[in-house]
């Protein structure tokens, strides 16, 4: 396996998982996602929600909700790009499955309210990218702006995407501007 990894450097590695064929829980899939990303440095994992096909042994099995497929794709992205671990997802699992009504990053933030709001002027990059609404480019832009001056108001975030979502999870100079915009 080590030889396979060494020989594949610089090449794109992708795998695919069918979701809902068996009785697997998201918890099992997330463990596999973390393991595969850690050990095989995958470019991504593709998920496909099961859909029954007539005249096959599984034709009477109900189709899987496509939203489950999407939530698992989001988990893969959070693991691969943002450094989330299996432990990060444990508090948001319900009976071993992800909530479908909210994205995993927001669910994680809501399950970890003790970490929020964060002070945007002092939070490190790794914490900024865990804020719902803040991605890598936005985190880099925030860090760039705060090198120029302290961020004190919503006006200082002008031009940054998802500001309405971000405000719930941040403070600027100790002030929270959520519901004040």
Where are the model-predicted features located?
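Conserved aromatic
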Residues: 23, 150-151
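Residue-level signature of tetratricopeptide-repeat
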Residues: 145-146
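Conserved AdoMet/S-adenosylmethionine-binding subsite of the radical SAM
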Residues: 1-84
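A short amphipathic alpha-helix within small helical-bundle interaction modules
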Residues: 117-123, 128-131, 142, 151-160
């Amino acid at each position: 396996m080590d030889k396979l990894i060494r020989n594949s450097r610089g090449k794109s590695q992708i795998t695919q998982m069918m979701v809902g064929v068996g009785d697997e829980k998201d918890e099992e899939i997330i463990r596999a996602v973390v393991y595969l990303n850690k050990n095989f440095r995958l470019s991504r994992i593709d998920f496909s929600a099961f859909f029954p096909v007539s005249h096959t042994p599984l034709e009477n099995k109900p189709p899987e909700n496509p939203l489950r497929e999407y939530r698992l794709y989001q988990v893969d992205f959070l693991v691969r790009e943002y450094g989330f671990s299996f432990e990060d997802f444990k508090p948001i699992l319900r009976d071993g499955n992800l909530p479908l009504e909210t994205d995993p990053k927001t669910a994680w933030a809501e399950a970890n309210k003790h970490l929020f709001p964060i002070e945007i002027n002092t939070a490190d990059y790794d914490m900024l990218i865990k804020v719902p609404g803040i991605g890598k480019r936005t985190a880099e832009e925030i860090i760039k702006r705060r090198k120029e001056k302290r961020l004190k108001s919503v006006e200082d975030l002008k031009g940054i995407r998802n500001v309405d979502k971000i405000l719930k999870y941040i403070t600027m100079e100790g002030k929270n501007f959520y519901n004040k915009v």
